[in-house]
């Protein structure tokens, strides 16, 4: 099997802990392109958070934001767009009412947040490349939400909310993109369907794709790609689902994966 397209997650994978692209990763992507192989990214981030990376890496291929909820190109062209079903939005807000979580809603290319001083707001400002619009009432966004994120450092609390939300599993994708984020997106906005959409848009068969990621929301694309690479710092259960394990994101694990792909072509 010859790999024709590499699809990388962003946070915890492509960028380091400072949310930055390292020289080693940038050079590895250039090596990949130099031999005619494709490279693109798929992320839980909104488009605003993906675009700076696309500019730095000069990605002209379609990319995925919101785990594939939006497939788009650097020139602004949108190839597909999946919003969360309003019934799901109403339902998850009802089941989290009173829970000790911060709430973020991404809609209309904007980020709305309930708490401007939350523990992970500063990090999200960098990741999303925008400032939050603070509000407590999100009801006017129910028909056009791309992603809802419930934020807490209480792992047991988020796990409990995820369990309670299983009733929406046939109408939405509900997964943790980080240990402290519980994300709700459209049913088709998952990285399994996302990598399939990217593969189709770019014209490379799924069995000739390589997926690189670090978290549970990356596992669906591991299952559909021809080969998969898990980052070394990711959870053990995620690493177990990948074909290979590479170094962590602070040790240029993506570059290691790319070089392994180049070595066998």
Q: What do the predicted segments below correspond to?
A:
Residues 24, 49-52, 160, 194, ...:
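Phosphate- and divalent-cation-binding pockets in alpha/beta enzyme and binding domains
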Residues 224, 228-265:
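Asp-based, Mg2+/Mn2+-dependent phosphohydrolase catalytic module
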Residues 36-40, 60-61, 147, 207-209, ...:
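Short active-site oxyanion
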Residues 57-59, 66-67, 168-170, 224-225, ...:
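Short, structured coil segments at secondary-structure junctions
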Residues 18-120:
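Active-site phosphate-binding/coordination module
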Residues 2-17:
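Asp-based phosphoryl-transfer active-site loop
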Residues 98-212, 216-224, 233:
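Conserved acidic, metal-coordinating active-site core of Asp-based
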Residues 32, 43, 67, 148, ...:
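Residue-level signal for inorganic ion chemistry
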């Amino acid at each position: 099997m010859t790999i024709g397209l590499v699809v990388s997650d962003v946070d915890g994978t492509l960028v380091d802990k400072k949310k930055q692209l390292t020289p080693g990763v940038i050079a590895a992507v250039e090596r990949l392109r130099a031999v005619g192989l494709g490279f693109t990214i798929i992320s839980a981030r909104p488009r605003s958070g993906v675009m700076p990376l696309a500019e730095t890496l000069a990605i002209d291929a379609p990319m995925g934001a919101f785990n594939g909820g939006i497939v788009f190109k650097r020139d602004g062209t949108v190839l597909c767009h999946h919003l969360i079903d309003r019934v799901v939005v109403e339902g998850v807000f009802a089941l989290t009412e009173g829970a000790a979580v911060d709430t973020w809603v991404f809609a209309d290319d904007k980020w709305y947040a309930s708490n401007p001083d939350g523990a992970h707001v500063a990090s999200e400002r960098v990741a999303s490349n925008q400032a939050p619009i603070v509000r407590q009432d999100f009801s006017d966004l129910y028909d056009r939400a791309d992603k809802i994120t419930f934020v807490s450092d209480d792992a047991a609390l988020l796990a409990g909310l995820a369990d309670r939300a299983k009733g929406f599993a046939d109408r939405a994708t509900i997964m943790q993109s980080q240990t402290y984020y519980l994300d709700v997106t459209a049913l088709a906005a998952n990285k399994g369907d996302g990598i399939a959409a990217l593969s189709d848009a770019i014209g490379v068969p799924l069995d000739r794709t390589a997926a690189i990621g670090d978290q549970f929301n990356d596992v669906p694309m591991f299952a559909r790609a021809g080969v998969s690479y898990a980052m070394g710092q990711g959870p053990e259960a995620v690493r177990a689902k990948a074909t290979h394990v590479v170094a962590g994101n602070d040790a240029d694990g993506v570059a290691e994966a790319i070089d392994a792909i180049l070595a066998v072509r």
